[in-house]
Amino acid sequence: MTVTGIIAEFNPFHNGHKYLLDHAEGIKIVAMSGNFVQRGEPAIVDKWIRAQMALENGADLVVELPFFTAVQSADYFASGAVDVLSRLGIDSLTFGTEEVLDYQTIADVYSEKSEEMEAFVESLPSDLSYPQKTQKMWEKFAGVDFTGNTPNHILGLAYAKACAGKGITLNPIQRQGAGYHSLDKEVSFASATSLRLHKEDSDFVDKFMPNSKLFQTSPQVSWDNYFQLLVYQILTNPDLTSVFQVNEEIASRLKAAVREISSVEELVDKVATKRYTKARVRRILTYILVGAVDNSLPKSIHVLGFSQKGQFHLKSVKKSVDIVARIGRKPWDMLTQQADNVYQLGNPELCEQNFGRVPIRVK
């Protein structure tokens, strides 16, 4: 039977995600971000709620991406997630994209010319951001055209790069309805961004989310819930450069701006430059919020939930993969658990995120 991997945030889970799961084949394994997501913000509902949403709509196994994989630029995010899924035995990767390209050929190009392509990236001017350099690489070596703001398209290329040489078949699915960051409400499939923005509109949420009641009754958070804590962290840390990816320039810009702002987005606007994109700044703010320092990734894989098919698959890979089903006195990943503790501070109704929690089971 085909074992299909899906890399996701489900922030929150909506009809477009269900469409993706419906079009995936065989056993469907989801590698999902935990309580903080790739663009550098807290997930609107916790990882357990999002895992349950996925399992109730076709996923067979949901595992958690460690913090240092989940909150990273596209290439590191894709590489870490593909590594997790590869160890779980996937032979196909299904993902949504704004533009269905021949990703398999693109992966082959990278497999053949990776050294030359990475050397090209290194040779580009330092005033370009890493995403800009990566785009120029794909334009030159694979003839990819970049038009508009298409994060899923960019992630698709990162997945192709991460899967190069691994024998994983790439299965892109055309994104349905609204674009990734679209705020449009008059569409057949609403974006996660739009659902976060219009979360109080119950009719809208009911229309575009298969688990709308679970979502609406679960504790929710946003950057606003952590703003004061973030400001405290910036003001009281004597050496911000001890935090992952914070250099002297970023530290100086943060210290100068933090007393002049009243929201996280204002801080992002003041600190971001051509070289430091807003997404990168948000990720850096997330690192500061949780006190992240450079750390190695866990070798084991944390399971959030499974169906009966998923449970059988877990048993089949258990001898070759270290699986963590319950986090107790022995930690799974200290940084991820530290981030979860901070996440819980955002809403007093949030449940314990690790200790005593067992995988969700669905029939």
UniProtKB/Swiss-Prot annotation:
It catalyses: cytidine(34) in elongator tRNA(Met) + acetate + ATP = N(4)-acetylcytidine(34) in elongator tRNA(Met) + AMP + diphosphate. Its EC number is 6.3.4.-. ATP binds at residues 7-20, 96, 152, 175. GO terms for cellular component: cytoplasm. This is tRNA(Met) cytidine acetate ligase. The lineage of its organism: Bacteria, Bacillati, Bacillota, Bacilli, Lactobacillales. One of its GO terms (biological process) is tRNA modification. Its main location: cytoplasm. Keywords: ATP-binding, Cytoplasm, Ligase, Nucleotide-binding, RNA-binding, tRNA processing, tRNA-binding. GO terms for molecular function: ATP binding; ligase activity, forming carbon-nitrogen bonds; tRNA binding. SUPFAM superfamilies: Nucleotidylyl transferase. PANTHER family: TRNA(MET) CYTIDINE ACETATE LIGASE. It is found in: Cytoplasm. HAMAP family: TmcAL.
